[in-house]
Amino acid sequence: AEPPVVVGAGPGGPLCALALARCGARPILLERGKPVEERSMDVERFWSDGLLDTESNVQFGEGGAGAFSDGKLNTGTRDACHRFILRELVGHGAPESILYDAKPHVGTDYLHKALVSLRRELLELGCDIRFGHRVTGITLTGGSLTALEVMGPEGCYTLPTRRAVLALGNSARDTFEMLYAA
């Protein structure tokens, strides 16, 4: 059977992929942007020179919008997954204070380190992480998902799957429009 696909790497997507990988599912994680280390350079270039990379910026890339802006990464304190999320972030380098603070705050520097650590664990568990890969279409057969159409660095390809989790950020308007049209 085809592996499950998680679309979006920040931070909900990697945490979803982690849960799947720990169950032995070996998911594929697709992210249109770049890893946080490369993305940091693109963001700095934008802030200093005004050069915008439309796929790797404050909105797109590993860690999502919250990776470069305080207050964007939130977890509801009454959410059932709250403890899992915070424990995983602490386990990957976030400050322990987020486990007991009324308004948990990770901070950009800690979040970047946690994202890199989380990515390493995902790779060790067999997750196939594909940066620079944007979902451009879906294939439905009899009303059920059978494949994702993907644009990657080497061009377009079809990724067969019957299971996909969309962990899209707030700026993936083109993807939302594509899904609505499908």
Language model region names:
Residues 1-92, 96-182:
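Residues forming the flavin
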